[in-house]
């Protein structure tokens, strides 16, 4: 397994936690999904959530963003309990960017119109809105495809578009749900390099969930392995391989 990420973080002891889950449990129709889950995403860290499909990885993201509410436990972002804030305010209050596994864009709109539509919602100042759109076009090298309807983009281009849309509100935290699913090997390599560069350039914290160890462990600082509703292991990629 080729390690793309040269581990910048030598010690996690002095890092500032940006997201903290404390003994979080969640059930759906009396079926346990998460059982007393606790972990920290540190500022400037790329953290992986690893486990088979159905183990609760996406549920964790839905709890953080407010789409779901835990049965027990607390979710702390920037020293604030997110459960005290309305769902509609969480993305802006806590500067969260979320990239879903599927969709996340307007299929029939062109790439540039996707950027404009989301920027219109999130950014009130016209000049700031124009600047951030131009930044995304440059950063993701969209120049040659800005007028193509999103539904005609390749899998990798669609994923880059959704990441760009998630970055429009200048988030502190980026959540990526199964970003490598259904992509070819070369596109996965490109996307992993993009994620690592994003963290380095934008200084944001990133949490990625995936079910493939070979994809996830090559681009994270640390990872958590989930099984049977619980965390069964934590560590750096070299410790977990």
Positions of the model-derived regions?
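H-loop/switch region of ABC-family ATPase nucleotide-binding domains
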Residues: 210-211
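Helix-to-loop junction immediately C-terminal to a conserved catalytic motif
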Residues: 65
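Conserved ABC ATPase "signature" region
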Residues: 128-145, 196
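Conserved ABC transporter NBD signature motif
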Residues: 73-82, 91-93
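The feature captures the beta-strand-to-loop junction immediately N-terminal to the Walker
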Residues: 50-52
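Catalytic Walker B motif of ABC-type/P-loop ATPase nucleotide-binding domains
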Residues: 174-178
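Conserved ABC ATPase signature
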Residues: 149-153
């Amino acid at each position: 397994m080729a390690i793309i990420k040269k581990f910048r973080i030598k010690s996690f002891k002095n890092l500032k936690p940006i997201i903290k889950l404390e003994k979080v449990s969640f059930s759906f129709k009396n079926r346990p999904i998460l059982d007393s889950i606790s972990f920290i995403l540190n500022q400037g860290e790329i953290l992986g959530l690893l486990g088979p499909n159905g183990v609760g990885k996406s549920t964790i993201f839905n709890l953080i963003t407010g789409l779901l509410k835990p049965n027990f436990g607390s979710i702390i972002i920037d020293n604030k309990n997110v459960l005290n804030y309305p769902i509609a305010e969480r993305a802006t209050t806590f500067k969260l960017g979320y990239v879903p596994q599927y969709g996340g864009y307007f299929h029939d709109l062109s790439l540039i119109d996707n950027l404009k539509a989301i920027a219109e919602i999130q950014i009130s100042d016209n000049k700031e809105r124009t600047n951030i759109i131009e930044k995304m076009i440059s950063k993701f090298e969209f120049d040659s495809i800005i007028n193509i309807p999103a539904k005609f983009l390749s899998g990798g281009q669609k994923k880059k578009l959704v990441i760009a849309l998630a970055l429009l509100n200048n988030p502190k935290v980026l959540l990526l749900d199964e970003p490598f699913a259904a992509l070819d090997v070369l596109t996965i390599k490109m996307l992993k390099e993009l994620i690592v560069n994003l963290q380095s350039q934008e200084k944001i914290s990133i949490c990625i969930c995936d079910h493939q160890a070979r994809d996830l462990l090559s681009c994270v600082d640390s990872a958590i392995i989930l099984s049977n509703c619980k965390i069964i292991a934590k560590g750096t990629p070299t410790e977990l391989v």
